[in-house]
Amino acid sequence: DERGIDNALLYDKEIFSVLSSKPIRNSLRGDDKTRDILYVKGLYKNSTLHIFVNHWPSNYGGKEASIPKRKLTALLIMKHISLIQEKDKNAEIILLGDFNENPNDENVRLLYDLGFVNLMEPMLGKPETGTYLYRGKDYFYDQIIINSGLKDKYELNVIDQSMYILDLPKYRQQKGKYKRYPYRFWAGNKLLGGYSDHLAIKISIHKIKE
């Protein structure tokens, strides 16, 4: 983006090998710049896995003004997903990252038209639960979204109910004005020495034995 921030995928080369990767240029209208989408195709347990790493346009400048930007991003991803599925209808695909929308917001919901399932959605409405806190309100901006190929009991599958927010006391501020907020590393120019202003999430994937 304009700050030089890019998406990345960290992986253990002992269990995952990259076959190909590329940034998908996310060109918004006008002079707006935002982060590229990182696409990685790799082998996990000798099965092909397609991963899209996302950081959708933020709500900076107002939510209503930013909604069209995220719609363009969603449509761009859907285009690339369709190209993958044209070649392999059983492709196993994961979308993950910071979508700057909740699972039930309009642009994330566009992905469901392709048969994708948001593993974060069942957590909506739980008290004091979320991955991001803004003005005292919890949001579920960080999500993992999978297609039916990862729920079909064939090859790679997400283990049921393995979706988990890494929400331990050390990851949140425990006192002061920002009590309960994720314990971030930086606050403006001030070094807090924490972890992130978002909480991490995780799932477990196993391979169905043939």
Label each residue range with its predicted role.
Residues 1-57:
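Structured beta-strand-rich core segments of catalytic domains in phosphoester-bond hydrolases
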Residues 2-6, 59-61, 100-106, 138:
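Active-site environment of divalent metal-dependent phosphoester hydrolases
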Residues 83-91, 101-210:
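Metal-dependent phosphoester-hydrolase catalytic domains
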Residues 1, 12-13, 22-23, 52-57, ...:
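Active-site-proximal beta-strand/loop segments in catalytic clefts of secreted hydrolases
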Residues 45-75, 79:
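Metal-dependent phosphoester/phosphodiester hydrolase catalytic core
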Residues 27-28, 60-68, 95-97, 130-132, ...:
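Second-shell loop/turn segments in exported
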Residues 73-96:
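His/acidic metal-ligating clusters that form di-metal
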Residues 7, 71-74, 78-81, 108, ...:
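Extracytoplasmic/secreted envelope proteins and their assembly/folding machinery
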